[in-house]
Amino acid sequence: MTQAAIDYNKLKSAPVHLDAYIKSIDSESKEGVVKIRGFANTISKDRAGDVIPASAWKTSNALTNYMKNPIILFGHDHRRPIGKCIDLNPTEMGLEIECEINESSDPAIFSLIKNGVLKTFSIGFRCLDAEWDEATDIFIIKDLELYEVSVVSVPCNQDSTFNLAKSMNGHDYTEWRKSFTAISSKAVPAQERNLSELEKLAIALGYVKE
């Protein structure tokens, strides 16, 4: 199986988290509520080399289920709802969002958002269809289902495997890493392969078997 096929299967089998930024905060809204606006996702290439074109947000699967219960979470934690989405608007630039964050849900997080310390959105979604563009080495996500929108403290790491680790549970991540390593040339030592430092460390510590 090629690396492209492995990455495609990863997209199809696990929730994915991508980031964008909060662009405005309205602190003059009703007491105990702050309204935030921005892009939950943009059409730009993300750190993992994936792109969600504007057309993907207009499919019948993309937003229907989420809008039945448009909760905003903190840090992708389903136990920490902090507000609700009041408007989602697919545009040519990406998925524009407007939310109300409630102070009563988490006063500390509310304060950090209101004071501009927390200013990043992240979405969790399931990829339903994608294609790999060999010329640009990116995955174009053509159809998806939005699971949730979160306010997060730190955007996804540049290392795509770290991004994947956050979007899978520990067992699934370990199994994926094993299958990833199995694709590599068995006759070539880890030190001589084109591996990231994270991959070499995982092999050295025994988390991934050669």
Swiss-Prot record:
User: Mind telling me which residues the site (Cleavage) is annotated on?
Assistant: 23-24, 166-167
Question: Which Pfam families does the protein's record reference?
Answer: Peptidase_S78
Q: What is this protein called?
A: Prohead protease
Cellular component GO terms, alphabetical: virion component
Question: Which keywords has UniProt assigned to this entry?
Answer: Hydrolase, Late protein, Protease, Serine protease, Viral capsid assembly, Viral capsid maturation, Viral release from host cell, Virion
Cite the InterPro entries for this sequence.
Peptidase_S78_dom, Prohead_protease
Which Gene Ontology terms cover its molecular function?
peptidase activity; serine-type peptidase activity
Outcome of swapping residue 148 to A: Complete loss of protease activity
- UniProt record similarity statement: Belongs to the HK97 prohead protease protein family.
- Active site: residue positions: 76, 122, 148
State the organism of origin: Escherichia phage T5 (Enterobacteria phage T5)
Name where it's found: Virion
User: A Gene Ontology biological process annotation?
Assistant: proteolysis
Q: Output the superkingdom of the source species.
A: Viruses
**What does the record say about PTM?**
Cleaves itself autocatalytically to yield the mature form of the protease.
The protein's role, per its UniProt record: Serine protease involved in capsid assembly and maturation. Cleaves the major capsid protein, the decoration protein, the portal protein to yield mature procapsids competent for DNA packaging. Acts as a trigger for assembly of the capsid protein.
